[in-house]
Amino acid sequence: MRKIITGLFILLSATFVSSCSKEDNYEGPDAAFKGRLLDNDSKENFMTETGGVQVKLEELSWSATPTPQYIPSKSDGTFEDTKLFSGHYRVTPANGAFWPVEGIEIDINGTTTQDFTLTPYLRITQFEHELQGTTLIMRCKLSAPKEAGLPRLLDIKPFVNISDYVGSGATISQYTDPNKVDINASWSDEIAAKTYEIKVPNLKSGRTFYARLGARVDDSYKQFNYSQIIVIKVP
């Protein structure tokens, strides 16, 4: 009996080792997808931050209702994923501070490039700034490319960081929420005519900061529409 058990153990062990030593026959990711997110007016890259837009991919090659995967935007308004499987996809920019867009169907194989045009909820216009001592003063106006159906405006916030990665996910908190301007109102001619002034006091002397303004509406995602980034050198 002991010999039988020992023999079976050796046989099972050999089978296990053999199965583990076989090479994985599944091919790995073989495709890449990249592109730009463009403002529909300026045709320049959409003002966003890292992860401020999610590019949703649904692979339709095997299912009509696939589980989506997402490519987060980069801070410069581009996106890229180099580890995809070739296939037929529906691609939709989502979860950002822009009016919903229809997805497109596209074959992704090799390196595929596709740009998307977005209409922001808000634009920050007439953006100006000055430094008074250690206080940064930023001024702007707001415009709404589409007024009908625009969600309520929430606020305008300053974002300040010591690198050029600056936005709601990369900011020095003491410079942001205490200095925000609450709006909490529907779009109106009064809002369109107003110049907003945001002050950020007590910047540290001898430091270089990167700053911008962001305005948001009360939609599901509460992402920000941004100004350009400015560089502030505090004497």
Across the structure, where does each feature detected by a protein language model lie?
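Compositionally biased low-complexity segments at domain edges in trafficked proteins
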Residues: 119-152
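Extracellular fibronectin type III
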Residues: 220-235
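Structured interaction patches on ligand/partner-binding surfaces of diverse proteins
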Residues: 96-121
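Beta-strand-rich modules
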Residues: 200-222
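Short, acidic Ser/Thr/Gly-rich low-complexity loop/linker segments typical of extracellular
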Residues: 60-76
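Short, ordered, surface-exposed loop/turn motifs in non-cytosolic proteins
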Residues: 42-64, 150-154
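Bacterial Sec-dependent N-terminal signal peptides
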Residues: 1-42, 235
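A short, solvent-exposed beta-strand micro-motif common in secreted/extracellular proteins
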Residues: 77-81, 85-98
